[in-house]
């Protein structure tokens, strides 16, 4: 089981969600603890990945040696979603 951490940015992003979006995103993030590279996860670069949760994207990093997943951002899909990924995590 991997330990989960959210950056302050990711926590703010999650706090802004509501209703079904919140439930689905939180469930997806919790699932990363059991399976950090679920089906459909896409490697962005380096240790950074993204998963799709409806219209939302969860950007995160996996550190296998430490069994750690750090969620850096939760955002609605747009051209800006993936900008500056390295600075997030």
For the regions a protein language model found, what residue spans apply to each?
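Enriched for short, Lys/Arg-rich terminal
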Residues: 1-3, 12-16, 20-23, 53-56, ...
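Hydrophobic, well-ordered secondary-structure scaffolds
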Residues: 5-6, 25-27
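Basic nucleic-acid-binding interfaces
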Residues: 5, 16, 40-43
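A short, surface-exposed loop/turn module that caps and links secondary-structure elements
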Residues: 27-52, 82
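Charged, well-structured alpha/beta interaction segments
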Residues: 7, 20-21, 33
């Amino acid at each position: 089981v991997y330990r989960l951490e959210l950056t302050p940015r990711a926590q703010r992003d999650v706090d802004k969600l509501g209703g079904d979006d919140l439930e689905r995103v939180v469930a997806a993030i919790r699932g990363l603890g059991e399976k950090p590279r679920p089906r459909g996860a896409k490697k962005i670069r380096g240790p950074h990945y993204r998963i799709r949760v409806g219209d939302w994207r969860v950007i995160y990093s996996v550190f296998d040696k430490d069994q750690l997943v750090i969620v850096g951002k939760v955002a609605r899909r747009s051209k800006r979603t993936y900008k500056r990924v390295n600075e997030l995590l």
